[in-house]
Amino acid sequence: MRPSKIKLATAVDTWWVPSSFVYIMLKGKAYTNNPKTVERFNATEDNKDRVHETIHVRQAVSIKDSWLRFYLEYLWEWLRNLPLITVKWHAAYKFMPMELEAYCCQNQPEYIDREMCDAWRDFKKIPIKTLKQYVKLWYKGDGDGPYIYKMTFSEFIKKYITKHLPE
């Protein structure tokens, strides 16, 4: 099914998702290995996890309404971010343009009402050197972030990273 035909992402319980992942999104379905997570995910349309995963669906619409092109672009962006693992091993994933848009907007349920979400294209323009500075700021010290004041990753993106986006 084409991404444009999917209204909201749905969660599915499965055995194959590694325990280190909350969800793995494939073609509009968020796979997880926790039945309670599925229940919570599917309960309301405006919970942040569902909004986050639905943003990925809208991103696929923005890439010629193709899952294949979306996943190829996603893989390419992950590979491009590999230098970030010198700071923290999962930074290559967390600071990808698609993830930055999804984390930034996951608390705005109205964001998924758009036909497509393409702010990731602006995040993509941020140089790796600049992203690496933000990775260091986020993972400052030994912790897993946030670096100050119990800031969420969404708040961190809005406060620091979005200032590098074109007007």
What residue spans do the PLM features occupy?
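Metalloprotease/metallohydrolase-associated module, dominated by Zn2+-dependent proteases
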Residues: R2-F21, L68-E167
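Short, solvent-exposed loop/turn segments at secondary-structure junctions
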Residues: Y31, T37, I55, K64-D65, ...
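Short pre-active-site segment immediately N-terminal to the catalytic Zn-binding motif
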Residues: Y23-R50
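Catalytic Zn2+-binding segment of zinc metalloproteases
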Residues: T54-L72
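Intrinsic disorder/low-complexity signature
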Residues: T10, T44-D46, E53, M96
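Residue-identity detector for glycine
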Residues: G28, A60, G141-G145
